[in-house]
C-alpha cells in the first residue's frame, strides 16, 4: 500500500498525467509484486513454524529423558540410603578388609618364595658353571694325554690352514686381476665418454647442418621453380625467335634464287648480243680467260647480292649497326646457353643433396621408430608392474576384509560376554557419540570393565571358599573351580615343566672331523657343513612338532573358557 501511495504522489507531482491503461498496468504490476512478497512471507512463516515445532518436540523428548533419569537417580538414592543396603555395604566393607589383609599376607608369602627361588636359581647356575668347567678341564686333560689325537688334530688344522691360504691367495690374485680390469674399464669409460661427447657434438652439428640443408633445399626448390619458369619463358621466346629466323632465311633464299635466275638470264642475253660483235676479237682471250672471268664475275655478283640483302635487312641502311646487333644477339644467346647449363648443373647438385637428405630422414625415422619401440617396451613393463601392484592391493584388501570380519566377531562376542556377566556400561554411555555398541574406539574400555568385573567375581569366590574352609575345617583344601559357569572342568590341568639340561658332550661335527684320517678338500668340507646344518634343522622341526600339540590344547582350552 505504501508503494501505491508513493506512486500516486509521484503521479500527482508530474504535470502530464498518464493514460488510464498505463495506470492499470502499473497497478497490476504492483499487485503481482505484492502477491509474490505475500507468498514468500507465508512460506517463510510455514518453515519457521515447522522448525519451531521440531525444536519444541526435541525439547519435550529431552525433558522426558531427564525426568526418567531423575526418577532413576532418586530411586537409587533411596535404595542406597535404606538400612538394609547400609548393613549390606558395611558387611561388604568388612569382608573386603579381610580379603585385602589375606591378599597382603599372600603377597608377602609370594615375595619370600620368589626370593628363595631366585637364590636357588643362582645356586643352580653356579653349579652348572662349575660342572661345565670341570668337564672342560677333564676333556682338556684327556686330549693332552692323547698325543695321537693331538697329532691328528694338528694335521687336520694344518691342512685346513693350507687350503684356506691357497683360497686366500687365489682370492688375492683374482682381486688384483679385477682391480686391473676395473682400471682398464675406467679408462675405457673415460674414452667412451669422450667419444660420446664428440658424437653428441657431431650430432648437434649434423642436426644444425640438417636444418640448414632443409632451409637451403627449400630455398633451392623455390629457386628451381623460378628457374623453371624462366626456362619455360626463354624456351617460348627461343621458339618464337627460331620461327622468325626460319621465316627470314626462307625469304632470303627465295630472293637469292630469284636474283640468281635473273642474273643467269641477263648473262645469257648479253653473251648472245656480244657474240656477234666481238666474236673475232675476243674469241681466243675468252677461251683462255673464260673460266677466271666467270669465277670472278660470280664472286663479285654474289658479293653484290649479299650486300644488297644486308642493306635490305638493315633498317637504317647501316651495315655496322646490323653487325653489332648480330654480335650482341649472339653474345646474349651464348650467355643464356651458359646460364641454362649452370642451372642444369645446380639442379643436378640440388637433386643429389635432396636425395642425401631423404636418406638421412629415412635413417632418422628408423631411429625414431626404434626409440618408440623401446618406449613401448618400457610402458609394457610399467603396465605389468602396475598390474602386480593392483593384484597385491586386492590381496591386501581381501586380507583386510577377513581381519575386519574376525574383529567384528570378536566385538560381538565381547558384547555378548558384557551382557552375560551384567556389567555396568553407564561410564561408556555418558560419553559423547556413544550408542551402546562395541566399536574400535571403546573396545579397551569394555575390556577394562570386564576385567574389573572378573576381579570382583574372583574376590567373591575366594571369600566364599575361605568361609567354607572355616566352616568345614577340612584338612584337604578343595580344588580351585572357576566361578564362570563351571568352565574350569573343561580346562586341561597344568603339566609339570620339564627342564632339559644342556648336553655337554662333544660336537658331532668335530666327531666327524676326528673320524676322517686323510686331509679334506673344499667340496668335502662343504658337504660336511651342509649335513650338519640339515641335522640341526631336523632336530628343531622335531622340537617344534612336539610343542605344537601342547599349544593346540592350550588354545582349545582358552576357547572353551571364553565360550
UniProtKB/Swiss-Prot annotation:
Region of interest: Disordered: 1-29
Positions with biased composition (Basic and acidic residues): 10-29
Intrachain disulfide bonds: none
Protein name, entry field: Coiled-coil domain-containing protein 63
GO terms, biological process: cilium movement; outer dynein arm assembly; spermatid development
InterPro entries according to UniProt: ODA-DC/CCD (IPR051876), ODAD1_CC (IPR049258)
Organism: Homo sapiens (Human)
UniProt KW Manganese keyword: no
Coiled coil: 18-201, 233-291, 341-422
CC annotations in GO: axoneme
Keywords (A to Z) from UniProt: Coiled coil, Differentiation, Spermatogenesis
Domain of life: Eukaryota
Function: Plays a role in spermiogenesis. Involved in the elongation of flagella and the formation of sperm heads.
